Amino acid sequence: MILRSYARNISTLAKKSNILKDVTANAGSMTIPTLDSYLNALEKLFVIEDVEAWCPAIRSATTIRSGKKREFTDPSIAVAAMGLTPEYLEQDLKTFGFIFECLCIRDLKVYSSALGGKVSYYHDRSDLGADCVLHLSDGRYALIEFKLGSCEIEEGAQHLLQIKQLVQAANASGKTNLREPDLLMVITGGELAYTRPDGVKIIPIGCLRD
């Protein structure tokens, strides 16, 4: 039940208290310490691997969300835990989108590991966010959004541009001296790779390995 509840919250900022509530609704009583012990075991077994928040000084500390994003080491585990089929995911695109995000994060971790890649996410209370912030060991970093369908690309690109503008504004005000993102990228489930006039790269997930 714990694995299934975690899977239902994949790629979200669900609090442990909410996961516990979901578990106890179907499997009797359980405490947070008990839940923690199970989650720690799942981490050690490389079943789950949460993503930490990126908290740059471009907003007040209380504005930026700092909770962990719930992720699996491999999205197929979450799919199996929920008993989902390809046919179901074709009908439930919202759930498919969360699974797709986990898949993208897994691939980015694998392909960037040789460059010391580390992933995090950015999300503030105004609902502005980047699904992934990929930092390399040499200081370069990318702001990334994951969009399963082409209709959502524009929204994702605008989010990335707004975060870049926040970095620029914070630097201009003297509040910080943060490096500007080296890459803005929307990873999609489509087939076309291109660069928009505003500089945002649109990359199909199948192109990442290249």
Where are these regions (language model features)?
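Accessory nucleic acid-recognition modules appended to NTPase machines
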Residues: M1-R140
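Hydrophobic/aromatic beta-strand patches that form the interior of the parallel beta-sheet core
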Residues: E71, S120, A142-I144, M185-I187, ...
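Conserved nucleotide-binding/hydrolysis micro-motifs of P-loop NTPases
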Residues: I77, S126, S150, E191-A193
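Switch/connector loops and helix/strand junctions flanking conserved nucleotide-binding motifs
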Residues: A80, I153-E155, A193-P197
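Short, surface-exposed loop/helix-turn segments at secondary-structure junctions
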Residues: E87-D92, G156-I163
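Active-site ExK catalytic segment of metal-dependent nucleases
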Residues: Y141-C151, H159
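Short mixed-charge
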Residues: Q165-L183
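Domain-level recognition of nuclease-like catalytic cores that cleave nucleotide substrates
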Residues: M185-D210
